[in-house]
Amino acid sequence: NLALGAVLAIALVGCAKPLPAEKIAYAGTWTSADSRVNITITPEGRVEYSNEQPGKSSSVSAPIKSFDGDNFDAGIGPLSTEFKVTQPPKQDAQGNWFMIIDGHTLAKVQ
């Protein structure tokens, strides 16, 4: 059973496609001011997301399936989560990067 899990995990890692060149600014670790929402997007096309709100939490660890404008879907097979990006990555005058995903303003920390 453990071996099957390891093979499945390796197979799932292999499903990620690199970020398109025009979306490379999405890559990095992003966090909300209260640290309750965190997302890491790798250049290889994987998402590690957590949203820890009082009484409700969610997390996603999956490859990015596709982009639709600024939004993106992450998941495997028929299971997927849409991330609504209302502000794509943008650098302010001080050189800090921000974006808004699912209504949460996130700052790039790495």
Segment roles from a protein language model:
Residues 35-80:
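N-terminal glycine/threonine-rich, aromatic-flanked beta-hairpin/loop signature
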Residues 90-91:
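Structural signature of eukaryotic scaffold interfaces centered on beta-propeller domains
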Residues 1-16:
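Sec-dependent bacterial lipoprotein signal peptides
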Residues 15-29, 42:
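N-terminal helix-cap/turn-to-beta initiation motif at the start of protein domains
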Residues 98-110:
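Edge beta-strand at a domain terminus
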